């Protein structure tokens, strides 16, 4: 992949993220704040952006979104890495990971 292709992919990801964020915020702000990991002020700003502003923001060369999962424990739980593959175990691991990520969202708010 060339650097131009990579930049085009980043811009497309930015546009997709911004459009999804606006849709979620406009449908249910409280749920969007939780799912996107944003505070209410950022959600209000995103919801109020015009199409031209969204396109301008999306054209940046850096990703506007980031992974919420930033530690090995959550990644291991989500991927069942280094654990036996059992349905009940996977469900428990996913639940545990969701609880950990939800607690981190409350820290942002």
Swiss-Prot record:
Superkingdom of the organism of origin: Bacteria
GO annotation, cellular component aspect: cytoplasm
Subcellular location(s) per record: Cytoplasm
Alphabetical GO biological process terms: bacterial-type flagellum assembly; positive regulation of DNA-templated transcription; regulation of bacterial-type flagellum assembly
Xref: Pfam families: FlhD
Any GO MF annotation of the entry: DNA binding
Keywords assigned: Activator, Bacterial flagellum biogenesis, Cytoplasm, Disulfide bond, DNA-binding, Transcription, Transcription regulation
Annotated InterPro entries: Flagellar_FlhD, FlhD_sf
Entries under HAMAP family matching the protein: FlhD
Family: Belongs to the FlhD family.
Domain-level remarks: The C-terminal region contains a putative helix-turn-helix (HTH) motif, suggesting that this region may bind DNA.
Function: Functions in complex with FlhC as a master transcriptional regulator that regulates transcription of several flagellar and non-flagellar operons by binding to their promoter region. Activates expression of class 2 flagellar genes, including fliA, which is a flagellum-specific sigma factor that turns on the class 3 genes. Also regulates genes whose products function in a variety of physiological pathways.
Annotated NCBIfam families: PRK02909.1-1
Assembly with partners or alone: Homodimer; disulfide-linked. Forms a heterohexamer composed of two FlhC and four FlhD subunits. Each FlhC binds a FlhD dimer, forming a heterotrimer, and a hexamer assembles by dimerization of two heterotrimers.
Designated name of the protein: Flagellar transcriptional regulator FlhD
Organism encoding this protein: Acidovorax sp. (strain JS42)
Lineage: Bacteria, Pseudomonadati, Pseudomonadota, Betaproteobacteria, Burkholderiales
Record gene name: flhD
């Amino acid at each position: 992949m060339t650097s131009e292709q990579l930049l085009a992919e980043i811009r497309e990801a930015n546009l997709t993220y911004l459009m999804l964020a606006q849709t979620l915020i406009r449908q249910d702000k409280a749920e969007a704040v939780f799912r996107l990991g944003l505070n209410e002020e950022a959600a209000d700003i995103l919801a109020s952006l015009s199409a031209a502003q969204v396109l301008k923001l999306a054209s940046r060369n850096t990703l506007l979104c980031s992974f919420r999962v930033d530690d090995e424990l959550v990644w291991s739980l989500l991927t069942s890495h280094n654990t036996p593959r059992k349905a009940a175990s996977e469900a428990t691991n996913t639940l545990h990971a969701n609880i950990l990520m939800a607690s981190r969202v409350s820290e942002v708010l």
